[in-house]
């Protein structure tokens, strides 16, 4: 690792004009200390900062870069689309094609494009309320569904990184219809329905949680959620912004086979550009304007350049690619375990298919309380030792790590080498 002076200078400049110097809080390294690295370029499995340092990328832009950075075919598709026009404010064939691809690979019957995961979940909740005529929403402690006021209560990594129970600016009225229960506790969901009869529009859950660290649903949890919701006339919204087309060819739906009444998507379907979607049963989706009374719109929704990137990303994400990503996740998990075990550091490698994180305690964490109860103080030293040795991991203990299909044997050699001092640093942390 050479100097990071240029990153430090840019961070100082940014703090004069941008709150915290960043445009999304976790990028500020607030929970691990130090200063943000300013990235200049990326290619394949690597990131390159403004000081010329190279990093093996284990963040993948928080999930979208399944195929690696700047994949030449995706770049070419974006360039070609851009030459035809950047935005039209009118329908395009690309919107039709990507909708067909999403419907073909998931449980949804109809889909609408939006610009971000936050928009997708916000719109899905509004639609569920409009369809059922009910106001209340059940969400889970530690699950993050974007920075929608009503869903920021107990929202996991987005606020946990800064040790905030929720966000100032979210009024009591905004959160009054949000019921928060522990993740992986279907009986708590049942109790909430019994306490609020005929008031709950939907249950929203990450299909597999990735914002309290990585926490997989246990004991057919998603299926139980759907069963309880339907017993009480409510809908199940599965948030696949993170898991969709990341955890398998069919997203988390391909892992446990549970179809949400509504499902949200993002990240991989964007190819790295701003795009997301929500979809579901046709009878529900047809409550959206212009067919139905529930209003939702967006000037840049279905942007042709983003659609080109998303289509090419999905086209290239073949079953063989998922085999590679799964093998890479398994390999990384093995190296993490070996390094920490060698140093006698209590840990568990949390897994949800190809997503993973490190819990610094014995045994698997099943909810946000479990994840917070670990030795989280070990993570900053662990993270910085990796970073100093050229490995760019997620800069929060409550975030998920992502691998791409572009990782090489040489990358894994670098990871293995960097994990030795990182595990030692974690063991010495107090």
From Swiss-Prot:
GO terms for biological process: protoporphyrinogen IX biosynthetic process. The modification N6-(pyridoxal phosphate)lysine is found at residue 267. Pfam families: Aminotran_3 (PF00202). SUPFAM superfamilies: PLP-dependent transferases (SSF53383). Keywords: Cytoplasm, Isomerase, Porphyrin biosynthesis, Pyridoxal phosphate. InterPro entries: 4pyrrol_synth_GluAld_NH2Trfase (IPR004639), Aminotrans_3 (IPR005814), Aminotrans_3_PPA_site (IPR049704), PyrdxlP-dep_Trfase (IPR015424), PyrdxlP-dep_Trfase_major (IPR015421), PyrdxlP-dep_Trfase_small (IPR015422). Its EC number is 5.4.3.8. GO terms for molecular function: glutamate-1-semialdehyde 2,1-aminomutase activity; pyridoxal phosphate binding; transaminase activity. It is found in: Cytoplasm. It catalyses: (S)-4-amino-5-oxopentanoate = 5-aminolevulinate. Pathway: Porphyrin-containing compound metabolism; protoporphyrin-IX biosynthesis; 5-aminolevulinate from L-glutamyl-tRNA(Glu): step 2/2. Homodimer. Belongs to the class-III pyridoxal-phosphate-dependent aminotransferase family. HemL subfamily. This is Glutamate-1-semialdehyde 2,1-aminomutase. It comes from Corynebacterium diphtheriae (strain ATCC 700971 / NCTC 13129 / Biotype gravis). The lineage of its organism: Bacteria, Bacillati, Actinomycetota, Actinomycetes, Mycobacteriales. The gene is hemL.
